Amino acid sequence: MDVELPNYRTGINRDAFVFCAFTGLSYSDIAKLTHADIHTDDNGDYWIIDKRQKTGTQFRVKLLPIAEMLYKRYKDTYRTGEKVFPLKGTYKTLNMSLRHVARHAGLSFNPTMHMARHTFATTVTLAQGVPLETVSKMLGHKRITTTQIYAKITNDKIGQDMTALSEKLNGIFKVAQ
């Protein structure tokens, strides 16, 4: 996020992408996200409470520290009823802008807004042990089978899980001699 970008608009697009990677929002959901959709609980934690644009299903996501930092960056810039990220253009033009961000950052792939949502589902949550049911609710999926598409488990993850299980079971079960 310390990459120098050619203009302010490209920075907003980058920030929106990173915010989606840490909240799971889709392009259509972040494009309509207003400050009124973000609530503070009794502990001072920020939550997005909204309905999916695509399905109308309600979802709730607690902001992780990076997402909270990005939210606060824009919170005082725009009024409460206004959108958190004042995105301009279409899904296609935003993805074209993300290509410029990737080029400035020296990345060898072209990120898309859907990749951000996919990253949240796989790398940020499921790979870190967040239960599939929780991820499904945060993504606003109506059926858990939709979330299972994101849950392709790698051999590394299986190995890590079995090592953790082995440590938990160590000494509990014994084979008779």
Task: Report the location of each language-model feature.
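Exposed loop/turn and edge beta-strand positions of beta-sandwich/beta-sheet ligand-binding modules
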Residues: 13, 44, 57, 79-81, ...
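C-terminal secondary-structure termini that scaffold catalytic or DNA-interacting sites
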Residues: 77, 165-177
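C-terminal catalytic core of Y-nucleophile DNA break-rejoin enzymes
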Residues: 53-72, 80-100
